[in-house]
Every structure is written in C-alpha cells, then in structure tokens.
Design a protein with these regions (language model features):
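Conserved glycine-rich Rossmann-like NAD(P)H-binding loop of the short-chain dehydrogenase/reductase
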Residues: 26-41
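C-terminal helical subdomain
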Residues: 174, 196-232, 239-241
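Catalytic loop of short-chain dehydrogenase/reductase
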Residues: 130-167, 179-180
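Conserved mid-core segment of classical short-chain dehydrogenase/reductases
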Residues: 67, 71, 87-103, 121, ...
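Conserved glycine-rich cofactor-binding loop
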Residues: 10-11
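Short C-terminal tail/terminal secondary-structure segment
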Residues: 233-263
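Catalytic Tyr-X3-Lys loop
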Residues: 87, 94-113, 130, 147, ...
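Alpha-helical segment proximal to the catalytic Tyr-Lys
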Residues: 121, 163-167, 230
C-alpha cells in the first residue's frame, strides 16, 4: 500500500487530507506539534478505514525533531508527501522581530526542504509532492506579510522541484486555497457574532455562495496524488470558489475589525 506523509495533519485541512488519502487506500503518517488528543483522533479515523496510521510528534522549526520523526519511518518509501503545516506571527511587517521571521521560514521552508531531501531519494516514479500555499501570496491579507512571503517561496520551490524531480516521474504541485472554514480562520475575529458576520460577508461575495471546506481541499490534493494527475507538473491550483473574481472591498471592512489593517 502507498504511504502518505502529511505535515500539520492533526486538524483542519491537514486532518482532512490524511483522512481522504486513507479513504483512497494510503497508509498515513502525519506530523503534529503538540495536540496529542487530536492526533489520536486522526489515527483512529485512519485505522477505521483499514489503513495504518503513525502520528509523529515534532516541532517543524527544530531540525533535530524533524529528523527524529522521519527516523521512525525507517526505510519505508514515502509515495505521497503533502506539506501543509505553517505557523507565523500575525502582525504588521514593521513590528516583526527576527525570531518571527526565523520561525516562519524554518517551518514553511526549512522543514519542507529537510523532509524532501530525506524522502525524495527513495520516492517511487509515481511519487507525488503537494504543497499547500495560501491566498496571502496573491492578495493582501492584514498581518500575513511574513507568512505570505514564505508561502510564495514555497510555490517557487514547488516549481524548482518539479523540474529537478520530474525526470524521475515525481510530480510536484501546489494548492492555493481561499477562505476555508477551519478553526484557524475562526480565530481572526474574537466573538461569535463577528465570526458569523465575517463568514456571511465572504459567502455573499463568493460566486458559489459558500466558504470552502477542508474536505474540498483534500479532494484536490487526492486528485494530485492520483494517476489521473500524472501529467500535472509545477502548477499552482487555485481553489477559492471564485471569491477573488470580485474587487477586494468586501474583505477590507472585516480585516479592519481585526485590528490588523494598516491605519
């Protein structure tokens, strides 16, 4: 059975990806940082589908911990690698400190390259690497400057790896989601009324009149990991319900309410 490795796999989009790839027949290994309860729930969900599940605890900003987590996989080849994890400080660029920059790039870029360098030599010709980018790479999202730059770098690495690994039959592509209904998005506004109004505003501005769901992102990732996507290479696929076909005015009001919009 193929083995899929997912970073940030204990919640949100990462969890949906792990469960979808398990449904499609993959054994699952996933890296999580600290929520052991959530990780156990993902393991149980994967095993309920008849697939093996291995939760690997590691701080992706610590190379030694990443190496130790990968050691647990032994010599088992990884067929599918989904780089989903990210972390940053959400604040204006002029307020960023060196450690914010270092942490963001260590997790988004450093850990990604470390994992690819470790697993790619044993990846089979049908191997797949999928990176999860974000809408902040092509639209201003208040407080996301450092994360946006790291995700943009991740998209660049996606294209470079597509060229370098392509001759071996390994595909490398990126998914760039829009507004997806996860617990992390819900933290942008502190109170329930504000969150509800924010989501309603986004839904109203989206041609499909709906926020994205983690399972919809997972479905696109599953396609990219399938044989049907064997000729898809070095692409960034946008999955946003069409929300950015509109002028950005609908979101400005709500980003101002977060206190992150420039004054």
């Amino acid at each position: 059975m193929p083995l899929a490795l997912v970073t940030g796999g204990s919640r949100g989009i990462g969890r949906a990806i792990a469960e979808r790839l398990a449904r499609d027949g993959s054994d699952i290994a996933f890296i999580y940082r600290r929520d052991a309860k959530a990780a156990a729930e993902v393991e149980a969900a994967v095993r309920a589908r008849g697939r093996s599940a291995t939760a690997l605890q590691a701080d992706l900003g610590a190379p030694a911990e990443v190496a130790a987590a990968l050691d647990r996989l032994g010599d088992t080849p990884v067929d599918f690698f989904v780089a989903n994890a990210a972390a940053t400080a959400f604040r204006p660029l002029l307020e960023m400190k060196p450690h914010h920059l270092e942490k963001t790039y260590a997790i988004t870029i450093g850990a990604f390259l470390q994992i690819v360098q470790r697993i790619a030599p044993r990846m089979p010709p049908s191997g797949r690497i999928v990176t999860i980018s974000g809408m902040d790479t092509h639209r201003y999202v208040a407080g996301h400057g450092i994360l946006a730059s790291a995700k943009a770098a991740l998209e660049a690495l996606t294209r470079y790896l597509a060229v370098e690994l392509g001759p071996r039959g390994i595909t490398v592509n990126a998914v760039n989601p829009g507004y997806v209904e996860t617990d992390s998005v819900a933290t942008y506004l502190a109170d329930e009324a504000g969150r509800k109004a924010f989501f309603e505003e986004i839904e109203g501005a989206t041609p499909l009149r709906a926020l994205g769901q983690p399972e919809e992102v997972a479905a696109l990732v599953a396609f990219l990991c399938s044989a049907d996507a064997a000729w898809m290479q070095g692409q960034v696929l946008y999955l946003d319900g069409g929300v950015f076909l509109h002028a950005p005015g609908h979101s400005v009001r709500w980003w101002r309410q977060t206190g992150r919009w420039p004054r």
